[in-house]
């Protein structure tokens, strides 16, 4: 609403209706305000045409927006599908499936061979060293089995040697590391030597104690014609000391010489006893000198 400027409604007082828009307009006209005229038919048509064009534009934009939304939804679905394919690609890939097929075919072939040769496998398991795989005559099978056993042990030793050789080839440490590794070996050898010497001394002491015990028992026994043989048997049957594990040729020679010395000592003691007995006999048979003089 504007004052003046439009004289169309000037002097025309709108019909006053109580409580309506016309009442307000009439009051405004009384106050001197000019009321805008109602739009004409042309204006209404132009306004409708402009509104129609705007509505068409809005509809077109909405359609384009719906198309874009559909495309976005399709892209989201495709992206999710590609993510799922990436997660299961190692399971559904053509190359992986071919590998699995080859593995299954190989396992199937092995199982078929096992089923076909089950009797032979059972027989070989029951006889681990059967020689049906190598043609050998019956008379040489025992020797061949022993040869195989020896070859197995030699093969184990060869395998250990090969592993040691491989280790020596792969060991590429500097000489300082070699020195650190070889340094404790002399100390260990010295301790082993001392331990061996202590064990040897203890063994000799046990042997000496055993000989003394056997000698005392031999002296306490009465002398009989077969006494020497009995003492020898007793000395031979004595249980060796527990500390002694292995005997060398030197130990055997030492024991032999000791036994010979013991035998000689026993023979000398027997000879002395016989001489004492003879002297006693002569002493009993001889007359005292006083008796001889009286008889004379």
UniProtKB/Swiss-Prot annotation:
Disruption phenotype: Lethal when homozygous. Residues 264-277 have a biased composition (Acidic residues). Signal peptide: none annotated. Keywords: Cell cycle, Cell division, Coiled coil, Microtubule, Mitosis. GO terms for biological process: cytokinesis by cell plate formation; microtubule nucleation; microtubule organizing center organization; mitotic cell cycle; spindle assembly. InterPro entries: HAUS2 (IPR028346). It holds the Pfam family HAUS2. The keyword Repeat does not apply. Residues 218-296 are annotated as: Disordered. Belongs to the HAUS2 family. This is AUGMIN subunit 2. It comes from Arabidopsis thaliana (Mouse-ear cress). The gene is AUG2.
